[in-house]
């Protein structure tokens, strides 16, 4: 976003002060939208010396004469030119400024506007700044942050020792990554994105996006009235073992619930009977295995089954042993269809196989699986969108790095999903997602599109659960997917 600001100013000739004025006014309008008539409130505006502080002075000036009271506490040591300019304007308009923060001052105001640090902050917050932020967080006042809560790294969402906990954050142009990755997402509060006049094509040139309702609605496959099951694709799911009999069913039903025409399950016998007995919609093919796990002896049979489908999902409930490892890697190396690779298939995957494949692949790891795949710690990979992009690009695949904010990337374009709740933190929900992605690929979406639509709907369905989210199960999630699609189309 910094580069877009600079291009807007230098290449398009938009005065930086105009951008700052629009930013400040947009904050006032957003507060009015959230709080109602601002005349009932008293505002304390905390300004640093950077351009974020300059935005704060614009906010304060535009509140003069509108609200009960407004006071700026200047917390900087020196000011950028645009901050200096708006400080001067605020003073000329009769605005009050103090340069010493007294804890008792918080008692005199209803709303605190945080314009201390913006997106340029990199070092940790210590000393007086940390003390002030902690006092603001404990004050119980309504807190509005300008652009990003002070103390959040706008590129990662990490807390730089301490950070403001906002009720409302007003940002400019596009959401920042720090707003959508945790813990920054928890501290942002309600996020409003204001258009302050950047050229549209510069905004559109950004290759990292938040997945939106409108985006997903536009990608949903059409359902022509004159159609048949072949119109909506065929999926093969290779899954299950003597240890895990439910995973194949959850994946299979995930595919059917998003509209797939036909779903076959290849499951070790007798575990396949569970699908046959409970879900007659699923075609369950019994696979004779050695000790209940897939091995190379099942390779040709599974390749044969893959010939008359559009996409293969592999991994849920396979188990993790040397026989499974050999089977998965040889199967994927030989398979000439798109593949969705999940769970145990990721745990045993040799990534060199991905480079050898000529057909598309989607990988859907959670952070633990991703850490094992790239031989790093969970902390190194969780929310690490740059690592995800690098992996996807190097291995010519789509990566769906699952977490509370899920990252979807093909290495060129990256999307962040923010739907969902803690009810998805439960065994089986990932199996459902695997089936959904395979189902949308079968219906004609690209692997990136299918992954984008699926993660959004998966989370949206969880949000529709009528009871406390902790009681959500994968089976309940399946029930809610069609309702999520119906509401999306409204």
Swiss-Prot record:
Tell me the residue numbers annotated for binding (6S)-NADPHX 2. Answer: 317, 431
UniProt-listed Gene3D superfamilies: 3.40.1190.20, YjeF N-terminal domain
Residue limits of the YjeF C-terminal domain? 212-488
Residues involved in K(+) binding:
52, 114, 150
Q: Where does the signal sequence lie?
A: none
From the record, give the transmembrane residue ranges: none
Query: Which stretches make up the YjeF N-terminal domain?
Result: 1-204
GO MF assignments? ADP-dependent NAD(P)H-hydrate dehydratase activity; ATP binding; metal ion binding; NAD(P)HX epimerase activity
Q: Where along this sequence does the record place binding of (6S)-NADPHX 1? A: 129, 147
Which reactions is this enzyme annotated as catalysing? (6S)-NADHX + ADP = AMP + phosphate + NADH + H(+); (6S)-NADPHX + ADP = AMP + phosphate + NADPH + H(+); (6R)-NADHX = (6S)-NADHX; (6R)-NADPHX = (6S)-NADPHX
Name the Gene Ontology biological process terms.
metabolite repair; nicotinamide nucleotide metabolic process
Residue ranges of the region described as NADPHX 2: 366-372
Q: What is its EC number?
A: 4.2.1.136, 5.1.99.6
Q: Which InterPro entries match?
A: Carbohydrate_kinase_pred_CS, CARKD, Nnr, Ribokinase-like, YjeF_N_dom, YjeF_N_dom_sf
Q: Does the keyword Lyase apply?
A: yes
Question: What note does UniProt attach to the cofactor annotation?
Answer: Binds 1 potassium ion per subunit.
Query: What is its biological role?
Result: Bifunctional enzyme that catalyzes the epimerization of the S- and R-forms of NAD(P)HX and the dehydration of the S-form of NAD(P)HX at the expense of ADP, which is converted to AMP. This allows the repair of both epimers of NAD(P)HX, a damaged form of NAD(P)H that is a result of enzymatic or heat-dependent hydration.
**By what name is this protein known?**
Bifunctional NAD(P)H-hydrate repair enzyme Nnr
Name the species this protein comes from. Answer: Thermotoga maritima (strain ATCC 43589 / DSM 3109 / JCM 10099 / NBRC 100826 / MSB8)
